[in-house]
Amino acid sequence: MVLRYSYVFKQPVNYSNIELNEIKNIKDEKVRQNSIFISYLNGLYNSLNVLEMVSISGSLPSKLIQSIFKIILSNYDYNAIGKHFKTESILIGESLFKWPSPRIQQFDQFFFQDYLYSSPENYKGSLVGVNEYSMVWTLGIILYQCLTGELPFPTYPKIVNFITSSSQNVEIPPQFYKPENSLLIQLITCCLFKNPAQRISWNEIVNHSFFKN
């Protein structure tokens, strides 16, 4: 049983017991949209443990990554993901001491400490809270890790170097530029632009060609 606090519900919620049919019956539109997004992220962590698979195998084939994320996306209403959501209290994070997989965490306790998955703008203090831009960045980091078996910025100095450099997007190692990886690399690149306004939106992600093949 996973208990997390959410400002959406103003009380502890057992996200693992939130079923899609229950979500569809929620009358408050904003709460319903947030619930779907929370369940989407929770499914990534609790059902698939993607990064545990990466840690065991080193990296994952593009087709397997596609299949994994298709399964997650197919369980939820595409039109609801990313609409009007404001999830200031949650994020995908990684405990550096206990868990190898991404988890939904309380924003105020974990976000700024989680340098592995935090978006560049949060180091500059230009954005407060978790928004669509930072969530897209985090998803891009997870996809990058699935493809390469490594984090793009495994240490804090490397993140700082990227933030202060003239580079506008994260570079993927050349050995992964293969025809079967082309759409995945395109998606990762669109998620990991330094400028948040240039990043792909959630609606564009779920409709991306990578998930359509």
Swiss-Prot record:
What the entry lists under Pfam families is as follows: Pkinase
Query: Known InterPro entries for this protein?
Result: Atg1-like, Kinase-like_dom_sf, Prot_kinase_dom
- What's any GO biological process attached to this entry? regulation of autophagy
Per its record, what are the GO molecular function terms? ATP binding; protein serine/threonine kinase activity
- The chain positions of domain Protein kinase read 1-211
Q: What is stated as this protein's family in its record? A: Belongs to the protein kinase superfamily. Ser/Thr protein kinase family.
Q: Return the domain comment text from this UniProt entry.
A: The protein kinase domain is predicted to be catalytically inactive.
Name it: Probable inactive serine/threonine-protein kinase DDB_G0280559
Q: Which organism is it from?
A: Dictyostelium discoideum (Social amoeba)
